[in-house]
Swiss-Prot record:
<feature type="binding site">
    <location>
        <begin position="126"/>
        <end position="128"/>
    </location>
    <ligand>
        <name>substrate</name>
    </ligand>
</feature>
<keyword id="KW-0276">Fatty acid metabolism</keyword>
<feature type="short sequence motif" description="Microbody targeting signal">
    <location>
        <begin position="290"/>
        <end position="292"/>
    </location>
</feature>
<dbReference type="InterPro" id="IPR002347">
    <property type="entry name" value="SDR_fam"/>
</dbReference>
<keyword id="KW-0007">Acetylation</keyword>
<feature type="binding site">
    <location>
        <position position="182"/>
    </location>
    <ligand>
        <name>NADP(+)</name>
    </ligand>
</feature>
<keyword id="KW-0443">Lipid metabolism</keyword>
<comment type="function">
    <text>Auxiliary enzyme of beta-oxidation. Participates in the degradation of unsaturated fatty enoyl-CoA esters having double bonds in both even- and odd-numbered positions in peroxisome. Catalyzes the NADP-dependent reduction of 2,4-dienoyl-CoA to yield trans-3-enoyl-CoA. Has activity towards short and medium chain 2,4-dienoyl-CoAs, but also towards 2,4,7,10,13,16,19-docosaheptaenoyl-CoA, suggesting that it does not constitute a rate limiting step in the peroxisomal degradation of docosahexaenoic acid.</text>
</comment>
<dbReference type="InterPro" id="IPR045017">
    <property type="entry name" value="DECR2-like"/>
</dbReference>
<dbReference type="InterPro" id="IPR036291">
    <property type="entry name" value="NAD(P)-bd_dom_sf"/>
</dbReference>
<feature type="modified residue" description="N-acetylalanine">
    <location>
        <position position="2"/>
    </location>
</feature>
<dbReference type="Pfam" id="PF13561">
    <property type="entry name" value="adh_short_C2"/>
</dbReference>
<comment type="similarity">
    <text>Belongs to the short-chain dehydrogenases/reductases (SDR) family. 2,4-dienoyl-CoA reductase subfamily.</text>
</comment>
<feature type="modified residue" description="N6-acetyllysine">
    <location>
        <position position="151"/>
    </location>
</feature>
<feature type="binding site">
    <location>
        <position position="88"/>
    </location>
    <ligand>
        <name>substrate</name>
    </ligand>
</feature>
<feature type="binding site">
    <location>
        <begin position="35"/>
        <end position="40"/>
    </location>
    <ligand>
        <name>NADP(+)</name>
    </ligand>
</feature>
<keyword id="KW-0560">Oxidoreductase</keyword>
Length: 292
């Protein structure tokens, strides 16, 4: 069985990296990555930059992306522009994209990675909490995609990769908000692939499973003993890591996937096929994690 590539737990760059793809796969391309200051988004930025790409990393937290950009540029030697931006605010997106275009003159790739999630029973979920997740995950993905379409992709082509999830595939307990939001994004992926394909724009989704070293796993994974049992029951019997997800996104964003559009690539080790969907167990963990 293939061994996973090395990874580190926190938001730090890899101490060493062995290229599985050509090192200049994205040479001098520019990628705009929402949620790029931490977690999976941070690792996507790093792996892209290690393949010759310059990046723009956008997040609501300017200190976070400033710190991330210094780490990324130092480790890879490529340029990284940190920007403060809320995906729910179209004027802020327009300003950020304008600044990125002024800095680089082009944007070739958009990675929609900004997201919000937590465990909550549907009957206890506030109207505002549901709306907030939909606004960030679904509306935010559309907002950034539409602005980049108008500002650059319509006339120059481009690639969009939306980071989604498998929650909606089976109706995951305590995840009606995130599952609905991400399922809507997968539908959006197909709609935009059809409408924007003639402008040489490819649009795909990447749906990760449980990934080590992420805030999502801490919030959603459950107690360690319970998580270990779930992982052992999954087909590959291990968690994924951020580098593996970044490699999958790299494939979709690169010329290797030049004839792939409107697709959802699931990168979860088969976990969605076997992970338990235990409402009571998840509810107990949600109650516990809310106190952390």
């Amino acid at each position: 069985m293939a061994q996973p590539p090395p990874d580190v737990e926190g938001d730090d760059c890899l101490p060493a990296y062995r290229h599985l793809f050509c090192p200049d796969l994205l040479r001098d391309k520019v990628a705009f990555i929402t949620g790029g200051g931490s977690g999976i988004g941070f690792r996507i930025a790093e792996i892209f930059m290690r393949h010759g790409c310059h990046t723009v990393i956008a997040s609501r937290s300017l200190p976070r992306v400033l710190t991330a950009a210094r780490k990324l540029a130092g480790a890879t030697g490529r340029r990284c522009l940190p920007l403060s931006m809320d995906v729910r605010a179209p004027p802020a997106i327009v300003a950020a994209v304008d600044q990125a275009l002024k800095e680089f003159g082009r944007i070739d790739i958009l990675i929609n990675c900004a997201a919000g999630n937590f465990l909550c029973p549907a009957g206890a979920l506030s109207f505002n909490a549901f709306k907030t997740v939909m606004d960030i995950d679904t509306s935010g993905t559309f907002n950034v995609s539409r602005v980049l379409y108008e500002k650059f992709f319509r006339d120059h082509g481009g690639v969009i990769v939306n980071i989604t999830a498998t929650l909606g595939n089976r109706g995951q307990a305590l995840q009606v908000h995130a599952g609905s939001a991400k399922a809507a994004v997968d539908a959006m992926t197909r709609h935009l692939a059809v409408e924007w394909g003639p402008q040489n724009i490819r649009v795909n989704s990447l749906a990760p499973g449980p990934i080590s070293g992420t805030e999502g796993l801490r919030r959603l994974g459950g107690p360690q003993a319970s998580l270990s049992t779930k992982v052992t029951a999954s087909p590959l019997q291990r968690l994924g890591n951020k580098t593996e997800i970044a490699h999958s996104v790299l494939y979709l964003a690169s010329p290797l996937a030049s004839y792939v559009t409107g697709a959802v690539l699931v990168a979860d080790g088969g976990a969605w096929l076997t992970f338990p969907n235990d409402v009571k167990g998840l509810a107990d963990f949600a109650s516990f994690s809310a106190k952390l």
